[in-house]
Amino acid sequence: MPIEANASLRSLAYDALKRAITEMDIYGTLEDIRLDERRLSQELGVSRTPIREALTLLEQEGFVRPVPRRGIFVVRKSKREIIDMIVVWAALESMAARLAAARAPAEDLAALRALFEEFRDEPPSEHMNEYSEANIKFHQTILRLSGCELIVDMTENLFIHIRAIRTVSLRQDHRAERSMREHLGIIAALQARDADLAERLTREHTLGLAAHVEKHGVFAE
């Protein structure tokens, strides 16, 4: 979608490119993912100058990397780096769950449970795209319901990789069904205002993803 010219074109291009990278299946293939300046310029409806400036910002943040005579590529992390990121995420999200147990309005927790209502009658593995989106929304909502902006900010630059890894992992080793059971357990703890249990279940759930990546993850190193 072309971006409007009533704001900084560089900022708009940056936001559009970062959002696009976030939504990419960057760990679903071992092939390098190249970003084409000309194509991006055409798709966003801006000149290549703000595209280059936006890519420079993304490079500084570690999301893309230039390769001489080849172009700009999306950065993918090694297995060790991914596991470390998941461990950090587990610490932050489990604290968010503890805070949410005390702070989150009851209606927001009910809405969190409602995310999974459509998957009660049929296994989530039969609706992977929809369940994957619900899964991502669940984890982002836990962070938001903590009421702690610092936790939200600290997870922002991890999100691109964590989202992509969760999307791939849900399709492996029957993780979708297990994921939903664990989500419902976390929600029950939140609704019971049991901060200790909510924190523990959230930590165990996310560290389970780290263990899965350790066992099953295949990455281009």
Outline where the language-model segments fall.
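Short linear motifs at protein or domain termini
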Residues: 1-98, 102, 218-221
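Juxtamembrane/interface motifs at transmembrane-helix termini
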Residues: 52, 103-106, 130-132, 151-152, ...
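All-alpha effector-binding/dimerization core of bacterial HTH-type transcriptional repressors
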Residues: 76-146, 174, 178-201
